[in-house]
Amino acid sequence: MLRVGRTTEQQLLLGEWACLGVLYPTPTHGFAIAARLKPGGDVGRVWSLSRALTYRSLEQLAVRGFIQAVGEEPGIAGGNRTILAATRTGRAQLRKWLAAPVVHQRDLRSELLLKLIIADICNIDIDEMLELQRAGVAVMSEALTAQIEADPSDVVTLWRNESSNAALRFLDRLPRPHA
């Protein structure tokens, strides 16, 4: 099987975006990032990663030049912990990712929620993206409603329509501190 490497920022996995988002506001070590990405962590509530996958994501971010080692501190169980920080490029790519609406309805639950959590952690205003997101979901919802009217027995389209309507209600209920 041929494996093609990922080369662009849009090809980052959600776990990599989550790690970059945790590093954006302040440098820290991988163990602390992994703790935030546990299922009960502030970011892990939306997108959780095992410690091994967290470190793999950090390696991928370093290879792309989105994060770098900036120091060390003593570890609790011996050895030193490497302190990592988002690079200027990494910070710019994260802001660009946060500014882009989620394209596919199937990704709204995971990617949109992750963007909301990361934007809050990083104190980045995403109001414009949310307006674009709402407009895109509204267009999708209108098209699905028309399809349902044409064929009310299509359960897949009915499901997608109900999901898009729920997404619209969710987007409408979000607090807008910058509005």
Task: Tell where the protein language model's regions lie, with residue ranges.
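Juxtamembrane/interface motifs at transmembrane-helix termini
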Residues: 52-55, 113-115, 147-150
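Short, charged/polar low-complexity linear motifs in solvent-exposed/disordered segments
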Residues: 87, 110-113, 173-174
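Basic helix-turn-helix/winged-helix DNA-binding cores
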Residues: 2-106
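Charged, low-complexity intrinsically disordered regulatory/assembly segments
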Residues: 124, 128-130, 137-179
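Short, flexible helix-adjacent loops and helix caps
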Residues: 42, 72, 99, 121, ...
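Amphipathic alpha-helical dimerization/coiled-coil segments
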Residues: 95-135, 139-142
